[in-house]
A protein has these predicted regions:
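Short, solvent-exposed aromatic-acidic interface loops
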Residues: 97, 124-129, 187-189, 246, ...
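Bacterial Sec-dependent signal peptides at the C-terminal "C-region" and cleavage site
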Residues: 12-22
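Beta-propeller domain segments
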Residues: 79-81, 153-318, 326, 350
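Repeated scaffold domains used in trafficking and secretory/extracellular systems
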Residues: 328-330
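Residues in well-ordered beta-strands of folded domains
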Residues: 7, 109, 124, 230, ...
């Protein structure tokens, strides 16, 4: 039977009851600045460390294998090795590419999977390269043969309103790096770069594909407040830095309105900020009562939150836990049993029911 969930934009209710007492947390292995992860199979998880290593972890034996690679990366501020996806015997990775003279870009590379050595070739570079250690994004998701990616605005603000530049946008390309012929540039947005799917984002560090409605969703960091969760929408504009999404500059000065007509409206906003990170629309056995609900991870308050989309009058938010496993950078649902693995702090964690 098909399952549906309904996105609504009215009253927001937040449950104050923690669900953590029904959960257990097990540390699997220690890591260093882990950033992205992806299941290879039911027993192996591939993980990036921002500092430059790609590791293959056997979840049963807890053995860690370091995979060599040829990426021209630069660990600079928030940048380094970022997200990673395994799909059909290929590895896709987003990373901070060294473009020379401390200029870098959010780039995407692809390699045939190999447990010893990954030989990557770039399939995307965000241009122009920028001398900044901030706001790279960058999450990846594959839908059919389309690769979606988030490119942060590199702390450049209004560059997110310039569709002739990649920073501050959502990217959509084919998995071989070619350009889809139905991207916005070929559908009424002739001044847009051909890879751009949507503009006006700041620092989106969450991206997921829903198995229930087939839509792509993202989370985005605001400034001082104004984090949000919403849907990726072709040819639209989330408004940064015309809009402030309810937040302010770090100095306390106003950025702009929370929202106004002509811009994409998010599903949920957070003021003050929770520092939204990785997200997923849960589908699995272990927490079957969560199927179709969005799980939102947080860096700032180290929380896991659940957004429920099955009520016509409100969006309900539950805080599942806080301050259990450190700053949560990523989460993956086990493809067989539905248990959840987190990159929290400097470790890989398993969460399951008691």
């Amino acid at each position: 039977m098909k399952k549906f969930f309904i996105l609504v934009l009215f009253t927001i209710n937040i449950s104050n009851i923690s669900l953590a007492e029904n959960l257990s947390f097990t540390k699997i292995v220690d890591l260093k600045d882990p950033w992205g992860s992806s299941f290879i199979n039911n027993e192996e998880l591939i993980v990036t460390e921002k500092s430059g290593k790609i590791k293959l972890i056997n979840l049963n034996s807890k053995k860690i294998f370091v995979i060599q690679h040829n990426l021209n990366y630069l660990e600079h501020g928030q940048g380094g090795l970022l997200d990673i996806i395994y799909k059909d015997d290929f590895i896709y990775i987003s990373y901070t590419e060294n473009r020379g003279n401390w200029k870098t870009s959010t780039s995407i590379a692809k390699a045939k999977f190999n447990k010893k050595n990954l030989i990557f070739e770039n399939i995307f570079q965000a241009n122009p390269p920028i001398d900044s250690g901030y706001h790279f994004g960058s999450r990846l998701v594959i839908k059919d043969n389309y690769l979606f990616a988030t490119a942060g605005e590199r702390n450049e603000g209004m560059i997110a309103q310039d569709p002739t530049k990649h920073p501050g946008s959502i990217i959509r390309i084919h998995t071989d790096g070619s350009i889809p012929k139905d991207n916005p540039k070929f559908d009424g947005k002739s001044d847009w770069l051909p890879e751009i799917y949507q503009i006006g984002v700041r620092n989106p560090q969450g991206l997921t594909l829903s198995a229930f409605d087939g839509k792509v969703y993202l989370s985005n960091h605001g400034a001082k407040g104004g984090d949000w969760f919403g849907e990726a929408k072709k040819g639209e504009n989330y408004g940064w830095k015309i809009l402030g999404w309810g937040g302010t500059n770090y100095t306390g000065t106003k950025i702009g309105p929370k929202w106004k007509p002509g811009f994409t409206k998010a599903i949920q906003y957070w003021v003050p900020s929770i520092a939204t990170s990785a997200i997923t629309i849960y589908k699995g056995k272990e927490f079957s009562e969560w199927n179709g609900h969005a799980l939102i991870t947080s860096l700032k308050d180290q929380s896991l939150r659940k957004l429920i989309f099955n009520d016509l009058s409100n969006v309900k938010e539950d805080v599942i836990f806080k301050n259990k496993i450190g700053r949560i950078r990523d989460l993956q649902v086990h493809p067989n049993n539905g248990k959840i693995y987190f990159l929290g702090g400097d470790s890989l964690w398993l969460m399951k029911k008691n």
